[in-house]
């Protein structure tokens, strides 16, 4: 009950053969012991809180009848059902268009403050990380290689991989009338079955030794 999760693709995370109401009622009845009517009342309240248009109407609909943004709001409502202390959001905006992404990010920040919960946000989008995070853990090949404040990551990155990651961001600035060539980190991510000894970034590191 203390940990909930929002998945990357809400359309595939929701059960296609169950109504929205059935899916949001289940955790309330199973974990909170609510009656069917109590679960419906609380479920509708949660759907209203996450900004789903016309919750009463959506209650009896199936996931395929909702847009991606609406499905993600349903997933967020389900995640909040048991009042978690920690909400894990795994790439929650990747499958959404840019306008809806902004709305969902704003909603998550708002809900985090209202519910007083911790938010663990997993993303490859550095722009989103800059907006959402207080502290950042950078992972490479399944290993955390740097952990610090979000400001320090962008202003004073310490690990070579973090530096390369920031350097590889697309730039629109031009030099002598030409755009800069997009930087990439040479080499490939190692297989998790054949990891190098010591630092996992060693084979791709521009400053070995």
Model-derived segments and spans:
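Conserved ABC ATPase "signature" region
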Residues: 38-57, 166-167
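A short, proline-enriched helix->beta-strand linker immediately N-terminal to the Walker B motif
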Residues: 81-85
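Helical segment within the ABC ATPase nucleotide-binding domain
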Residues: 102-116, 127
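A short, surface-exposed alpha-helical micro-motif characterized by mixed small hydrophobic
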Residues: 129-131
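Short, glycine/charged-rich "phosphate-handling" switch motifs in NTP-dependent
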Residues: 135, 147
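Charged, flexible cofactor/metal-binding loops and thiol motifs
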Residues: 149-209
């Amino acid at each position: 009950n203390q940990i909930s999760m929002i998945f990357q693709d809400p359309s595939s995370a929701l059960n296609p053969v169950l109504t929205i109401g059935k899916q949001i009622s289940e955790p309330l009845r199973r974990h909170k012991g609510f009656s069917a009517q109590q679960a419906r009342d609380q479920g509708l309240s949660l759907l209203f809180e996450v900004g789903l248009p016309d919750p009463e109407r959506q209650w009896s609909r199936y996931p395929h009848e909702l847009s991606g943004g609406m499905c993600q709001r349903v997933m967020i409502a389900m995640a909040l059902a048991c009042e978690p202390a920690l909400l894990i959001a795994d790439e929650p905006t990747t499958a959404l268009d840019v306008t809806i992404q902004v709305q969902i990010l704003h909603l998550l920040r708002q809900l985090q403050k209202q519910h007083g919960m911790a938010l663990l946000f997993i993303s490859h989008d550095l722009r989103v990380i800059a907006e959402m995070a207080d502290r950042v853990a950078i992972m490479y090949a399944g290993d955390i290689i740097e952990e610090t404040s979000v400001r320090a990551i962008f202003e004073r990155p310490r690990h070579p991989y973090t530096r390369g990651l920031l350097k590889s961001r697309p730039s629109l600035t031009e030099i002598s009338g030409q755009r800069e060539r997009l930087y990439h980190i040479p080499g490939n991510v190692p297989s998790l079955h054949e990891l190098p000894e010591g630092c996992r970034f060693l084979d791709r590191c521009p400053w070995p030794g």
